[in-house]
């Protein structure tokens, strides 16, 4: 079974393992015992309707959530207890396979909880979540510390019979065993008790961190007519309050980026910059620094309890990087070139500011503004001109075209009202095999920013595919925070936001292309799972997309060849800034999780560490520590934010495989290998082995340096 994030799921990891479609479940494989869910709570009900059943988003009522969580936890624990106390000797079928079907009510519930957490958050939900976090942590700990269950898993792993199983099934067993062992299943009684205490407190802290940052993200800045200098008309229209001459700037990246790029009001640029980068760092009730210090201390203690020198060593053991040293070495290979390039970029910007007699020294709130001037001067490339050809609806259709050519998928809007949605903004498409018409899954899109929706962009899998107990198809969503345009107006996006749109669609395609037999292998290794999404960004400015979909929103004319050429020549423009802001966050994440954090002051540590590394004063970390939700609102990316760079080595190398092929980025042979080896298997194959099967060798790190313009 697949788990989503109610707290951070040890239960989630519990069943996160399994083989691909082609490996049929044995005929005598038992199903999990019927869940003792006896209430009529709609959040626990089996999904009904078309497409193999869909979430009942139209029946979501927060009043049902708290009792549903408690009932689902009890049901899952009861199911696992039946497996643990089975009088028959442990086998792959009656233990590992049986666990795959346990907790389905919790799976369904976590989809709704995820919506309330990320898409429709309210103070009431956040209060409820805080109340439930310790209970959920105790539930997860009870699973991991079920000695009888772990003994059965261990017996299956040590059984001579395992050697006769397929490689996929062996991997499934190993992953399930490792999940338990790495979460303290082998600790003594005192160790288990302390582990449970740490888990319970971390659950509270992660939840509180996310709530505090979200509260700061709900702050806005009101602008008057005198504050709009330099802003594009489309942006002004998007943020204008309809009933007054007031423009409201949300505290989101999708609003901050264009404001800092175009606003001629330097004082306001600084205000907007400080508001965005000070989230969680105002010294008020929403300040997160004390939470971070405690989170780091507890993670460090837990790692020591499990026998590791620090949290990062524990976290990276089963990643592609394997050790913090290897992850750090990759980042430090890129860092000198990145900060050297920043110096060149700042010099070019300062030259323009001096020529304009601006009387300033470039500061962080000036970087985007003057970088845009450099872009226009060097490449005669105006990013707002590019934006006129990047219409969200057309970009969506372009993604569908790419998915058709590479994956053989077709996307068709579902009939209005046939699939429940949780907000009127959400639209749904059916995904089919273009050649056979066979149903593959559903794709949901929630594109617009609104109060209660977390910032950024992300993909969510509501249901992963598997075949071990009958074919189950995928339900996956993409979520963005575009500012909704006035009715009847097109939504124009920046090139960066268009790239992110493609990126998140890559995650969706990874889910849709899965061919695993057991849902447990639908998971992934963190420093590998960003590879597929980062790779899909490369198709945004391919000829097929440019010629067919990047058309001027008013004239319908295709993007001029001269503009295309400027975009390609400027492909590595501002790479110093983008690489440095990312590496600042990734290196800080790793550093925080390798030191002994006793007595740490996160703000002071951030300042001192950046100074030690020679962080340019004109660039700030992409995610400063006080609002680094990837790392502190849960453990998904903790000690793992480097994974984007690790994945980008694979991305750059794989992109060269397409560039070298006769058919370029749409070469059918390379596309077939891509899907077969790097998308469809999910976690059924070790990522390093999967990449070698695709490329015939390991990825070349120099491909990354070439790609970023850092090659010698």
Give the label of every model feature segment.
Residues 13, 24-26, 30-235, 247-248, ...:
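N-terminal helix-rich structural modules
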Residues 29-64, 71, 230, 234, ...:
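C-terminal, non-catalytic "cap/extension" segments appended to globular domains
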Residues 63, 67-85, 97, 101-104, ...:
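A broad, structural surface signal
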Residues 5-16:
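Bacterial N-terminal signal peptides
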Residues 172, 204, 211, 215-250, ...:
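Active-site-proximal, well-structured secondary-structure segments within enzyme catalytic domains
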Residues 18-20:
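Bacterial signal peptide processing site
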Residues 49-66, 113-132, 155-197, 250-290, ...:
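Short His/Asp/Glu-rich catalytic/ion-coordination signatures at enzyme active sites or charged loops
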Residues 483-502:
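Short pre-active-site segment immediately N-terminal to the catalytic Zn-binding motif
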């Amino acid at each position: 079974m697949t788990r989503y994030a109610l707290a951070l799921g040890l239960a989630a990891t519990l069943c996160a393992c399994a083989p691909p479609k082609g490996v049929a479940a044995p005929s005598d494989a038992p199903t999990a015992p019927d869940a003792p869910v006896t209430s009529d709570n709609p959040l626990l009900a089996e999904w009904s309707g078309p497409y193999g059943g869909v979430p009942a988003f139209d029946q979501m009522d927060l009043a049902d959530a708290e009792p549903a969580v408690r009932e689902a936890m009890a049901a899952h624990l009861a199911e696992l207890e039946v497996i643990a106390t089975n009088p028959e000797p442990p086998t792959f079928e009656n233990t590992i396979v049986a666990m795959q079907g346990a907790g389905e009510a919790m799976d369904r519930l976590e989809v709704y909880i995820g919506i309330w957490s990320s898409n429709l958050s309210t103070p009431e939900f956040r209060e409820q979540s805080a109340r439930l976090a310790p209970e959920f942590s105790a539930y997860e700990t009870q699973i991991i510390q079920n000695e009888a269950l772990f003994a059965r898993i261990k017996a299956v792993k040590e059984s001579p019979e395992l050697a006769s199983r397929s490689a996929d099934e062996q991997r499934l067993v190993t992953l399930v065993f490792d999940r338990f062992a790495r979460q303290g299943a082998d600790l003594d009684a005192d160790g288990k008790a302390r582990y449970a205490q740490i888990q319970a407190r971390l659950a509270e802290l992660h939840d509180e961190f996310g709530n505090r940052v979200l509260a700061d993200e709900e702050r806005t800045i009101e602008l008057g007519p005198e504050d709009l200098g330099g802003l594009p008309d489309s942006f002004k229209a998007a943020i204008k309050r309809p009933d007054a001459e007031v423009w409201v700037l949300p505290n989101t990246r999708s609003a901050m980026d264009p404001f800092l790029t175009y606003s001629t009001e330097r004082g306001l640029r600084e205000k907007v910059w400080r508001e965005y980068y000070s989230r969680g760092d105002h010294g008020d009730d929403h300040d997160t620094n004390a939470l971070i210090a405690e989170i780091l201390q507890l993670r460090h203690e837990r790692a020591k309890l499990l026998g590791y020198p620090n949290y990062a060593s524990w976290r990276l053991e089963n990643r592609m990087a394997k050790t913090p040293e290897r992850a750090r070495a990759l980042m430090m290979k890129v860092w000198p070139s990145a900060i050297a390039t920043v110096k060149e970029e700042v010099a070019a910007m300062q030259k323009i500011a001096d020529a304009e007699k601006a009387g300033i020294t470039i500061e962080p709130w000036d970087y985007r503004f003057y970088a845009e001037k450099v872009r226009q001067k060097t490449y005669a490339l105006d990013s707002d001109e590019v934006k006129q050809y990047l219409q969200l609806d057309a970009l969506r259709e372009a993604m569908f075209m790419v998915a058709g050519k590479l994956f053989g998928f077709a996307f068709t809007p579902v009939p209005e009202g046939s699939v429940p949605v949780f907000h009127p903004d959400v639209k749904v498409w059916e995904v089919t095999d273009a050649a056979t018409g066979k149903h593959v899954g559903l794709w949901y899109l929630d594109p617009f920013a609104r109060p209660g929706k977390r910032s950024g962009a992300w993909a969510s899998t509501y249901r992963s595919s598997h075949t071990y107990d009958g074919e189950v198809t995928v339900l996956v969503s993409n979520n963005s925070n575009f500012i909704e345009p006035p009715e009847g107006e097109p939504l124009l996006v920046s090139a960066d936001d268009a790239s992110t749109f493609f990126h998140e669609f890559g995650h969706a395609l990874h889910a849709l292309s899965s061919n695993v037999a057991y849902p447990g292998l639908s998971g992934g290794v963190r420093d590998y799972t960003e590879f597929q999404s980062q790779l899909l960004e490369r198709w945004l400015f391919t000829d097929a997309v440019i010629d067919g979909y990047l058309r001027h929103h008013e004239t319908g004319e295709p993007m001029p060849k001269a503009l295309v050429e400027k975009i390609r020549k400027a492909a590595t423009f501002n790479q110093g800034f983008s690489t440095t802001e990312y590496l600042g966050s990734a290196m800080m994440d790793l550093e925080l999780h390798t030191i002994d954090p006793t007595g740490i002051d996160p703000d002071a540590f951030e300042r001192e560490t950046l100074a030690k590394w020679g962080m340019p004063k004109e660039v700030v970390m992409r995610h400063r520590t006080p609002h680094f939700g990837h790392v502190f609102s849960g453990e998904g990316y903790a000690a793992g934010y480097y994974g984007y760079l690790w994945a980008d080595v694979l991305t750059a190398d794989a992109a060269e495989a397409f560039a070298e092929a006769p058919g370029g980025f749409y070469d059918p042979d390379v596309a077939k290998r891509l899907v077969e080896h790097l998308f469809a298997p999910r976690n059924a194959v070790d990522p390093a082995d999967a990449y070698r099967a695709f490329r015939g060798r390991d990825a070349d790190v120099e491909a990354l340096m070439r790609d970023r313009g850092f090659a010698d």
